[in-house]
């Protein structure tokens, strides 16, 4: 099983940026926790962080075709990353959108996600543990292989 974890703009600043909102855990610490969980269950986990939408799209185009699951925290691209949204829509793997903070308890502009319509599900407000929950959910789809976004939800026509 292959899972991609995509971290959008400014997530490289976790641990320093507004710890009262995003927590004190760094991105490197989050990635290490995720890698440890993945290794324990025999999952290949590839992570990427970029402040540039095009770099995230390049990663998806290179690695996403045979992915069994995608976890994405798009950061600010949540609200305007249409090219990223289109890149995700091309792929067939289940997509879980993760946000460290509860975006619906914050400023109104954060309430709209252009990513959500192509995501299988969304986890918000649970801090770094939201990534672990996403992995656990994807593990429940193990063996279904790429092309199972609708099957994972039981909504395939």
Curated annotation (Swiss-Prot):
Catalytic activity: 3-dehydroquinate = 3-dehydroshikimate + H2O
Record keyword Lyase present: yes
Pathway, per record: Metabolic intermediate biosynthesis; chorismate biosynthesis; chorismate from D-erythrose 4-phosphate and phosphoenolpyruvate: step 3/7
Alphabetized Gene3D superfamilies for the sequence: Dehydroquinase, class II
Keywords: Amino-acid biosynthesis, Aromatic amino acid biosynthesis, Lyase
Stored CDD domains: DHQase_II
PROSITE patterns (alphabetical): DEHYDROQUINASE_II
Family: Belongs to the type-II 3-dehydroquinase family.
Entry GO MF terms: 3-dehydroquinate dehydratase activity
Site feature (Transition state stabilizer) residues: 17
Protease found in the keyword field: no
GO biological process: amino acid biosynthetic process; aromatic amino acid family biosynthetic process; chorismate biosynthetic process; quinate catabolic process
Assembly and binders: Homododecamer.
Record-annotated active site: 22, 99
Gene of this entry: aroQ
Biological role: Catalyzes a trans-dehydration via an enolate intermediate.
Name by which UniProt lists this protein: 3-dehydroquinate dehydratase
Entry EC number(s): 4.2.1.10
Residues at which substrate binds: 73, 79, 86, 100-101, 110
